[in-house]
Curated annotation (Swiss-Prot):
PANTHER family, sorted: PROTEIN PSBN (PTHR35326:SF3)
Protein name (database record): Protein PsbN
Localization annotation: Cellular thylakoid membrane
Entries under InterPro entries matching the protein: PSII_PsbN
Keywords: Membrane, Thylakoid, Transmembrane, Transmembrane helix
Transmembrane segments: 7-27
Family the entry assigns: Belongs to the PsbN family.
Listed Pfam families: PsbN
Membrane protein topology class: Single-pass membrane protein
GO biological process: one example: photosynthesis
Listed GO CC annotations: plasma membrane-derived thylakoid membrane
Lineage: Bacteria, Bacillati, Cyanobacteriota, Cyanophyceae, Synechococcales
Role description: May play a role in photosystem I and II biogenesis.
Length: 46
């Protein structure tokens, strides 16, 4: 088995974290938790 270089390991770790944060953000924005989000512009009355 080949040994991975430290740079490759860091790049893969960074990519996985970025994808996880992106997925969680999309889930929060459009999934079931989105019903709890409030729109501050709708709440503000002129």
């Amino acid at each position: 088995m080949m040994e991975a270089s430290p740079g490759l390991s860091i790049a893969i770790t960074f990519a996985v974290i970025l994808l996880a944060l992106t997925g969680f953000s999309i889930y929060t924005s459009f999934g079931p938790p989105s019903k709890q989000l409030e729109d501050p512009f709708e709440d503000h009355e002129d």
